[in-house]
């Protein structure tokens, strides 16, 4: 996470130690994810796949200091859960960084039952829980008044937008991009259905780029050939390395994220930092980035009519949206850059009465 690299040297921070079970998970590494920058940062102590004795030694060394232990991915990686339980033996302050409950196919009550049976016992030992987005803050607050529930966000590596000139032939077209897997949960079909609801004239003012692959690609390609999408240019770009995504994004005006559920949706951060307008489903944590109206619009997940209205509004205001590129970049630098997120994160830790 880029904000981690910004923590060293900030007021109140003496040491930053990152303990991880592994680096560059295979499937993400193949897409271009890299941890080289973090590993090369000499201001941060990186501990990779440590033995339990090594973790014990770190807890013992820092328990008599003002130490926060933050756990991210505690349910996904068994070693992290073991390290969390080990931390309970030491005098350190604990916090959790988590995505909201994964509700796609798993209703909230199922998560509540699991939490009651497996996790409730630990609540009194956790001071703060940082939740991605603001959609399920109330769920976590119901469990206890002892911990502070804080809306949080992912952030991505900062990329500078490169100057470019809009092609003349696309001057009045909204160029709309999707980046992600082509699965039922990501719901790209809803995006195409929404475009089918546009008028023939509106469709001639729209082109769509789709980056990604998945089990629904063949179905989506069939939909794209429908007469109901006549006039819309739909281009399937396939899977692309992560380091090529910023360059692709800068060829578009807006990004759409139509997911039925996304814990966050970091592609939204990338889009805004490059100045794109962002159309986001209300079942994505990244909808929190749209509190500023000029950043984009939120639509009801799975509602093609509502998404069509967002697309129509974007088409009708294409000039203003293009004029707002620099404003979105400036807002992103101030609010969702690594430094901005690090400052927000640290302010919650330092403000703790026990700190």
Where are each of the predicted segments found?
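Nucleotide-activated donor-binding/catalytic signature segment of Leloir-type glycosyltransferases, i.e.
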Residues: 42-46, 221-240
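Conserved donor-binding/catalytic core segment of Leloir-type glycosyltransferases
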Residues: 167-186, 192-195, 209
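Short alpha-helical donor nucleotide-sugar binding micro-motif in glycosyltransferases
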Residues: 239-240, 247-252
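Aromatic "clamp/platform" in nucleotide-sugar-dependent glycosyltransferases that forms part
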Residues: 260
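Short hydrophobic beta-strand element within catalytic cores of glycosyltransferases
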Residues: 277-280
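Conserved acidic donor-binding segment of nucleotide-sugar-dependent glycosyltransferases
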Residues: 292-293, 297-304, 313-319
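A charged, aromatic-enriched C-terminal amphipathic alpha-helix characteristic of glycosyltransferases
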Residues: 319-350
């Amino acid at each position: 996470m880029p904000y981690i690299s910004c923590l060293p040297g900030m007021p109140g921070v003496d040491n930053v130690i990152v303990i991880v079970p592994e680096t560059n998970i295979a499937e993400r590494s193949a897409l271009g994810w890299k941890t080289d920058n973090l590993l090369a940062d000499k201001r941060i102590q990186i501990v990779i796949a440590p033995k339990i004795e090594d973790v014990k030694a770190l807890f013992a060394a820092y328990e008599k200091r003002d130490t926060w232990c933050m756990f991210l991915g505690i349910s996904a990686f068994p070693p992290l859960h073991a390290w969390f339980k080990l931390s309970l033996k030491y005098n350190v302050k604990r916090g959790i960084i988590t995505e909201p409950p994964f509700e796609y196919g798993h209703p909230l009550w199922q998560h509540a039952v699991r939490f009651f049976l497996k996790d409730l016992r630990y609540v009194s030992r956790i001071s703060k829980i940082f939740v991605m987005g603001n959609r399920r803050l109330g769920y976590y607050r119901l469990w206890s008044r002892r911990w502070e529930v804080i809306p949080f966000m992912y952030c991505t590596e900062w990329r500078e937008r490169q100057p470019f000139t809009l092609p003349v032939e696309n001057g009045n077209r909204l160029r709309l991009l999707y980046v992600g897997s082509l699965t039922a949960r990501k719901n790209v079909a809803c995006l195409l259905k929404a475009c089918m609801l546009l008028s023939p004239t509106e469709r001639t003012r729209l082109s769509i780029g789709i980056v990604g692959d998945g089990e629904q690609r063949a179905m989506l390609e069939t939909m794209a050939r429908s007469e109901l999408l006549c006039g819309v240019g739909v281009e399937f770009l396939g899977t692309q390395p992560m380091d090529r995504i910023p360059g692709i994004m800068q060829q578009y005006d807006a990004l759409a994220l139509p997911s039925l559920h996304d814990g966050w949706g970091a592609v939204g951060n990338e889009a805004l930092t490059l100045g794109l307008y962002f159309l986001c489903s209300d079942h994505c944590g990244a909808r929190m980035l749209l509190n500023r109206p000029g950043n984009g619009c939120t639509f009801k997940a799975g509602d093609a009519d509502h998404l069509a209205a967002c697309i129509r509004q974007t088409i009708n205001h294409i000039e203003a949206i293009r004029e707002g590129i620099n404003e979105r970049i400036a807002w992103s630098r101030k609010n969702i850059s690594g430094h901005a997120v690090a400052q927000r994160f640290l302010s919650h830790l330092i403000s703790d009465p026990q700190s």
